[in-house]
């Protein structure tokens, strides 16, 4: 029954990728996609010495229209390294008849393998409805990087948190047992709009790091985030000293980026960082800095400066 279900899921998928070792290098041995998804596996991406495979997921027309359902499976073989990214933000267009735009990704990461899912953000247009689910199957020595993030919309044009519905679910299963379960939901309310709740912030992001190869990146990110936030959230002091009666601002300026890190799993083998920021570029800078240490594994830095 499980085999039949897997075959049925594969048949319904709009995309399927398999990465295996070929002559000592990670290579894409299967790459299938159909409308509205397009997958590109460039032969040259990053330094050849890294031996990693790269994939670009693209939608026709640069976005997902109302009612579209994109379903993709990824299998990263034992000892392989693969990165899956995009060429620009994923645009989600206005919902028609309240139909959601959906994306589903199911990835299996082999033993001693590395899979990095490092897309650009999702940008939902006014009145859009979007739902995505990502499921990752791992082993105790698998290595996984997941960046899941979205923006308020075309906020530079004044369109800010005007979409109707956004939901993102991430599950990590360790040998088919739940290791990490996360869900983010933003929905317009009659009492408070999304814009009311998010105030001046325009970006929400989550970064998951799991596996023995990524422990040093976890430790560095946790240390630097702790230092950054201790400075940004430190109460302001006046020139008059600790006991000065000089008035402080009633509404102190909020920091342009807020981040936190939390371990998960047995012995803290995984870490999740959560970020919210005023600008997309500040999150790009955060990701570029903290994920630069992936270059030896992937042959290139994620989110390079344009």
Swiss-Prot record:
Q: Which domain of life is it from?
A: Eukaryota
| A molecular function (GO) term | nickel cation binding
GO aspect biological process, one term: protein maturation
Q: Which UniProt keywords apply?
A: Chaperone, Nickel insertion
Assembly behavior: URED, UREF and UREG may form a complex that acts as a GTP-hydrolysis-dependent molecular chaperone, activating the urease apoprotein.
- Entry function: Required for the maturation and activation of urease via the functional incorporation of the urease nickel metallocenter.
Q: Which family does it belong to?
A: Belongs to the UreD family.
Name of the protein in its database record: Urease accessory protein D
Recorded source organism is: Oryza sativa subsp. indica (Rice)
Please name the taxonomic classification of the source. Answer: Eukaryota, Viridiplantae, Streptophyta, Embryophyta, Tracheophyta
């Amino acid at each position: 029954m499980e085999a039949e279900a897997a075959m049925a899921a594969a048949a319904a998928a709009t995309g399927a990728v398999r990465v295996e070792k070929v002559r000592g290098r990670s290579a894409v041995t299967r790459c299938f996609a159909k409308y509205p998804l397009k997958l590109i596996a460039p032969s040259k991406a990053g330094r050849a010495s890294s031996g990693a495979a790269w994939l670009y997921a693209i939608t026709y027309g640069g976005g997902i229209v109302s009612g579209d359902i994109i379903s993709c499976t990824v299998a990263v073989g034992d000892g392989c390294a693969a990165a899956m990214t995009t060429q620009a933000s994923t645009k989600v267009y206005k919902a028609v008849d309240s139909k959601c735009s959906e994306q589903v990704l199911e990835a299996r990461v082999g033993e001693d393998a590395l899979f990095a899912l490092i897309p650009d953000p999702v940008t939902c247009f006014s009145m859009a409805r979007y739902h995505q689910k990502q499921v990752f199957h791992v082993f105790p020595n698998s290595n996984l990087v997941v960046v899941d993030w979205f923006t308020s919309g075309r906020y530079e044009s004044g369109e800010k948190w005007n979409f109707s519905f956004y939901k993102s679910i991430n599950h990590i299963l360790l040998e088919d047992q739940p290791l990490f379960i996360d869900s983010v939901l933003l929905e317009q309310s009659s009492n408070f709009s999304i814009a009311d709740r998010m105030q001046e912030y325009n970006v929400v992001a989550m970064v998951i790091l799991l596996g023995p190869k990524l422990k040093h990146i976890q430790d560095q990110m946790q240390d630097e985030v702790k230092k950054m936030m201790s400075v940004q959230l430190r109460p302001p002091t006046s020139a008059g000293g600790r006991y000065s009666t000089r008035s402080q601002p009633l509404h102190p300026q909020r920091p342009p980026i807020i981040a936190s890190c939390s371990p998960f799993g047995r012995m803290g083998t995984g870490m999740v960082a959560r970020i919210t920021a005023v600008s997309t570029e500040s999150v790009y800078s955060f990701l570029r800095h903290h994920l630069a240490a992936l270059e030896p594994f992937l042959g290139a830095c994620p989110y390079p400066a344009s």
